[in-house]
């Protein structure tokens, strides 16, 4: 096969690299610091910060092949030619560099001269007011008869706020084979859904800024954002009927065929056998969904009940139901996962080595789903009424139990039931609206032209503590440039600074300046962040500055040292996890401040504390070895030769000078943060916490320095002392004589409990005290049962004594007695005095209540209602309720006397 998917991808990247673009690796499917998206769903989604000017791109020309996931049209997957959940998006991007004419030229050149597509089959859409784009296509030989001018709905990309602009789309005519009704060009010009005219490329010209009120202004930095779905392009180049008939899909479908009696027919597109189409759809659903499942689990999202985890669960369950249609032997699962990782792993390196993790997670969910199907079928059978199924039940089967709509319809048809499918669709639509955050839209922030245009150079000095600096930029709180500020809040930029700006998970430096030009005013900074052109913006709440002012700039040396300790410690923790637990563990988020460091990572199971202590011990060894820090400046190729760890959320130019931080052979990472000069300065480390951040995602919190650890130990000892005192109080309140021996032994153990003097003893002491706490609580429970028994006997004797009176009722008042206990005791006494009515008042949990047991309960209720407002409920011989007012016992007794 001439054009494989790998070749199509590489041709794209090679072409744009030759045109001066930096080819970026595919990012994780899980968005980084972007709560607006559940998954990365387009090639540009990972580049939002560059387009909004929050971050400076490593190159003004970028290209990528990005793995994407969309699940808003999941019901269509398997039944159309091109709908998929997981797909690759090819893209080229210009950030303040080339614009319309060059972007169109690249697209035309690549498609015609490199992919060798016939330009006579090109059909183009342009925005109706975009004459430049229309004329540019004419220059490339596309006749006006194959260019359509469209309105805003079709050819203007606008999210209502922020960067926006017109777009142009390239369609390719696949010929009459894909036009069975011979409709012709009308399909394209009237935008009718079809398989003949296929969109292969969309180019967005981001040239305006929408202020949110429909007012448009020219962007300071005009951008190009393009996208071409690789599966569509491959289908055209391979002359495949659908995306599912291309090389990678056919390889996966071949594995399915080996485990079932059905066969996939690549020519079925041109046939009309509905029964065969059901089997075809099953092949497509399984192959598509298993690709998505493999990628998501490999990135640490395991099937589960919430958010991303629920999407993975739903995909797997839909695939498993498709397996049932083929009577597919589930032994296909392991070779399917192996094949997916094999065909994609060379480019998408996050898959490498994840075979077993993915397979184990799938099999665990398969077992769980067997039970779920049975529960769903039980719900289905139980919910049938009057030969109908309620829409809410159909939706519940779909949403909660993972039954596809087609399966529900099969169940309904077999039982000849009536269902209001329109109501079901309305419920599904409501659910889709709630889940809209995963739809195919992006929310770019408003581009700030003042920050973009501010390009005066500023330098960060890593090692200096105090410097003289000059004010080169001044902005108010709305980022508007100003000449001066007087006792106001705002942002100041200096020609050089010693204050680190928040980035790479490291918090900004604490610091201040002395402004000689403003009567030596001291101004403290409450934040430092990087602007789009890499200058450090210093935020202040109250200060006076003027452009050109000279200041003394100082950072807090103690703060900086603690941050350096913790940042270097985070690197060592990352390396220790890889060395001691699993070499495939990768940091997936980190935070470093003066107080602590944290690291997030994905792993298939929880680590034990024994494993964490092994990691801790390894780090301490590295600290004790006092390894010198090496700071190496090299290019991307040089850093790769050093095996330096880089992260998906960072992009690095081939020609950019990169900073590598190395501690011997133990840790080598690309990093722009501040670090200790040698590991001995970290002094010590201690893991303070470890917990789940979601399914398969974990966080470790760790501290450093003897002073910080001593303070932490002192704090924990305070908590241990509080626990010891609390346990002593519990033991002192135990009254059961039978427990005296155990009580004495536990009291002795608590008296001899020694608080840890060194941090390495803390966990052992915490575990020991926790065991004592469990034992004391068990004793407390036994004592409570004994006290309840004693109380029950006391109440019983009191009621028996009252029952001897020559009255039709027994009236008694109690305080703080468990209503359940009171009811049980009263019932036992009632069994001996069946002709009595028991009226029991009780003040429990500060709530006055009453209880009636025995004969004439209903008669008594009517009598009481005539005198009091009350509420409650019960049966013929039992009532429990409360009065809406305080009740005088003597008055109540007088009323009850009338029952005689």
From Swiss-Prot:
Binding site for Zn(2+): 567, 571, 671, 675
Enzyme class, UniProt record, top EC level: ligase
Cofactor(s) recorded in Swiss-Prot or TrEMBL: Zn(2+)
Protein's cellular compartments: Cytoplasm
Catalyzed reactions: tRNA(Ala) + L-alanine + ATP = L-alanyl-tRNA(Ala) + AMP + diphosphate
Primary residence: cytoplasm
A GO CC term assigned to this protein in UniProt: cytosol
EC number(s) reported in the record: 6.1.1.7
CC cofactor note: Binds 1 zinc ion per subunit.
PROSITE patterns cross-referenced by the UniProt entry: AA_TRNA_LIGASE_II_ALA
GO biological process: alanyl-tRNA aminoacylation
One function term, GO molecular function aspect: alanine-tRNA ligase activity
InterPro entries: aa-tRNA-synth_II/BPL/LPL, Ala-tRNA-lgiase_IIc, Ala-tRNA-ligase_IIc_anticod-bd, Ala-tRNA-synth_IIc_core, Ala-tRNA-synth_IIc_N, Ala-tRNA_ligase, Ala_tRNA_ligase_euk/bac, Thr/Ala-tRNA-synth_IIc_edit
Keywords: Aminoacyl-tRNA synthetase, ATP-binding, Cytoplasm, Ligase, Metal-binding, Nucleotide-binding, Protein biosynthesis, RNA-binding, tRNA-binding, Zinc
The keyword Cell wall biogenesis/degradation is annotated on this UniProt entry: no
Signal peptide: none
Alphabetized SUPFAM superfamilies for the sequence: Class II aaRS and biotin synthetases, Putative anticodon-binding domain of alanyl-tRNA synthetase (AlaRS), ThrRS/AlaRS common domain, Translation proteins
PANTHER family named in the record: ALANINE--TRNA LIGASE, CYTOPLASMIC, ALANYL-TRNA SYNTHETASE
Domain notes per entry: Consists of three domains; the N-terminal catalytic domain, the editing domain and the C-terminal C-Ala domain. The editing domain removes incorrectly charged amino acids, while the C-Ala domain, along with tRNA(Ala), serves as a bridge to cooperatively bring together the editing and aminoacylation centers thus stimulating deacylation of misacylated tRNAs.
NCBIfam families: alaS
Protein task: Catalyzes the attachment of alanine to tRNA(Ala) in a two-step reaction: alanine is first activated by ATP to form Ala-AMP and then transferred to the acceptor end of tRNA(Ala). Also edits incorrectly charged Ser-tRNA(Ala) and Gly-tRNA(Ala) via its editing domain.
Family: Belongs to the class-II aminoacyl-tRNA synthetase family.
Protein name: Alanine--tRNA ligase
Organism: Mycoplasma pneumoniae (strain ATCC 29342 / M129 / Subtype 1) (Mycoplasmoides pneumoniae)
Top-level taxonomy: Bacteria, Bacillati, Mycoplasmatota, Mycoplasmoidales, Mycoplasmoidaceae
